[in-house]
């Protein structure tokens, strides 16, 4: 049997308010703080900040 994966899926939501999001994996034991990335949002055609939210 395969090992159980310790990573959790998190949703990175655009702060531009467009509703666009990305899904990433992170290990909660090694990365205790919330993720935030500056990535491209195609709805506003700019690089904006994406902040972590839990997947519902």
Curated annotation (Swiss-Prot):
<comment type="similarity">
    <text>Belongs to the bacterial ribosomal protein bL33 family.</text>
</comment>
<keyword id="KW-0689">Ribosomal protein</keyword>
<dbReference type="GO" id="GO:0006412">
    <property type="term" value="P:translation"/>
</dbReference>
<keyword id="KW-0687">Ribonucleoprotein</keyword>
<dbReference type="InterPro" id="IPR011332">
    <property type="entry name" value="Ribosomal_zn-bd"/>
</dbReference>
<protein>
    <recommendedName>
        <fullName>Large ribosomal subunit protein bL33</fullName>
    </recommendedName>
</protein>
<dbReference type="GO" id="GO:0003735">
    <property type="term" value="F:structural constituent of ribosome"/>
</dbReference>
<dbReference type="GO" id="GO:0005737">
    <property type="term" value="C:cytoplasm"/>
</dbReference>
<dbReference type="Pfam" id="PF00471">
    <property type="entry name" value="Ribosomal_L33"/>
</dbReference>
<dbReference type="InterPro" id="IPR001705">
    <property type="entry name" value="Ribosomal_bL33"/>
</dbReference>
<dbReference type="GO" id="GO:0015934">
    <property type="term" value="C:large ribosomal subunit"/>
</dbReference>
<dbReference type="InterPro" id="IPR038584">
    <property type="entry name" value="Ribosomal_bL33_sf"/>
</dbReference>
């Amino acid at each position: 049997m395969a090992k159980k994966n310790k990573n959790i899926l998190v949703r990175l939501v655009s702060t531009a308010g467009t509703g666009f999001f990305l899904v990433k994996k992170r290990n909660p034991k090694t990365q205790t703080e919330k993720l935030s990335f500056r990535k491209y949002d195609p709805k506003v055609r700019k690089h904006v900040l994406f902040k972590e939210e839990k997947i519902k």
